[in-house]
Amino acid sequence: GAARYSRTINIPKDWKKKPVELFLERTRPTWVYVDGELVDSCNFISTPQRYLLPKKVKPGKHLLEIVVDNGRGVPEQVYGSSHAYTEDTQTNWNGIIGRIELQLVGSVESKSAETPAGAISSSSVVPLVGAIPSRSVASSTALQMLDFAKDFHIEGAHFYANGHRIFLRGKHDAAVWPLTGHVEMSVEGWMKYLGTCKEYGINHVRFHSWCPPEAAFLAADSLGVYLQPELPFWGSFDKKDEKLMTFLHQEGVNILREYGHHPSFHMMALGNELWGDIDKMKEFVDDFRKI
């Protein structure tokens, strides 16, 4: 059901006329209100939700209300057929976990940079303008050097990563977090979890019908563990079900854009034990490979 969370926020004077974004790292479908007026709604469940506050929200105090509903906002099949929602493991929790922030962003139009998929050169400089959320002034520019390449392919019966033949010894992760009832959101927690996996010789984790948060990828990048997120689905791909197909496609795009730059992000699946329209599945794969 729906739960309403509220807090009085204070917009600093030096944020005047600058774009302010509400960042919700992991939650359920939400509806955001400022001073009683609806800003927008969002149903992203695999990635952060971001709300650009209206320009009329001036510096000073305002009432921020967030309605979180774990019983509506996503296709019916997702509730009982994915570990993103299942009561069997992490539970169908209600709330907002991880980071909850008001961020001063640079340019709304230039929050990311892209390089052609599959193109690897010995040296590339990619300017990321506003790509990292910042509380700095709106005109600030971040320039980062990306000194790694990511290539993962098959030759014969073997996997190769950046030219090296590898063997994947993996485990299944169904979002089992019995002590909290929701996924771990800290890098420290994931370092412990993935570090334990490595102690047992495991170098690959498959996330059954769900996607872990940013902290998991950061920890895996550091430890050298390969991660395989999945769309939050376990069932039939039915091209006639436009609501389901639109939702899953958007979740896939979100996952790739949010986490696909991580070295540890090496594979992605459309869900668990799927059946149905094979051509529709191929269409999804073709679309995702272009990102």
Task: Cite the ranges covered by each PLM segment.
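Accessory beta-strand-rich segments of carbohydrate-active enzymes
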Residues: 1-107, 174, 213-214, 223-228
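Short, cationic motifs built from Arg/Lys/His that form the positively charged side of catalytic pockets
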Residues: 6-7, 145-146, 150, 206, ...
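Short intrinsically disordered coil segments
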Residues: 23, 81, 113-115, 145, ...
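Residue-level structural signal for beta-strand termini and adjacent loop
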Residues: 42-44, 147, 171-172, 271
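Extended acidic/polar, glycine-enriched regions
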Residues: 55-63, 117, 136-155
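Active-site mouth of glycoside hydrolases
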Residues: 73-75, 88-90, 154-291
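Low-complexity, Pro/Ser/Thr- and charge-rich linker/hinge segments at domain boundaries
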Residues: 88-99, 106-113, 145-161
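Intrinsic disorder/low-complexity segments
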Residues: 107-144
